[in-house]
Amino acid sequence: MKLVLDTHTHTISSGHAYSTITENAREAYKKGLQLICMTDHGPKMPGAAHLWYFGNLKVLPEKIEGVEILKGVEVNIMDEEGNLDLPEGILKKLDIVIASLHDVCFEPSDDIERNTKAIINAIKNPYVDIIGHPGNPIYPIDIEKVLMAAKEYGKFIEINNSSFVSSRKGSEENCFLIAKKAKEMGVKIAVGSDAHVSFDVGRFEEALKVIKNAGITEDLVLNTDVGKIKEYLKEKKRKIGGEEE
């Protein structure tokens, strides 16, 4: 399966990443990607950018180094109600929004009901597009309930390559179970490198192994065609009243 876009990348503005957007785009071009999503951490992540940073992403060009750039964020899910660390006024200006649980913002717990509720409530937010690294073992979830919500609200579940390489140790089994259930239920998948340095942009090898082993086909994967993400965003804009019916 060939992927032509990366839905999850970070720049130095995330506080603990090491490359600029230009460096990320240059690496993406070298690897044959057509598009990357710029998804720096939301402001409640220590060292992350102020909310004004996200409000001003509009100044970036649509293409850098020959690669299309979608301006976005990886927001932090803050509580069981699915509240996020950026206000609606900022979220509505962004192209793409990943919502994730991080231990500095949401206390890790074995409470499956609590974790599941937080993610499902984030899914219900009309500005959220992707649930980031849901296989993290420090946040056990009811996989079927989360996937049912994702399908109902037309959102994507992420298979995150860094979960198998450098972060969230022990994610492999959960990610496979998520991928397998997504295949069974017809839930759509986004594959993200979660690159925190330019060299990792477009690294999908481990995530692709999981997808293959779970039997997921191209029709369920957002990253196989730039047209898919553009069509999704057009429909999202229509649903939230951003353009005329």
UniProtKB/Swiss-Prot annotation:
Domain of life, source organism: Bacteria
A Pfam family the protein falls into: PHP
Keyword Zinc set for record: yes
Residues annotated as binding Zn(2+) 3: E74, H102, H133
Cofactor: Zn(2+)
Binding residue positions for Zn(2+) 2: H16, H41, H196
EC number(s) reported in the record: 3.1.3.-
InterPro entries linked to this entry: Phosphatase_YcdX_put, PHP_dom, PHP_phosphatase, Pol/His_phosphatase_N, Pol/histidinol_Pase-like
Keyword Hydrolase recorded: yes
Family: Belongs to the PHP family.
Protein name (record): Probable phosphatase Teth39_0577
Organism: Thermoanaerobacter pseudethanolicus (strain ATCC 33223 / 39E)
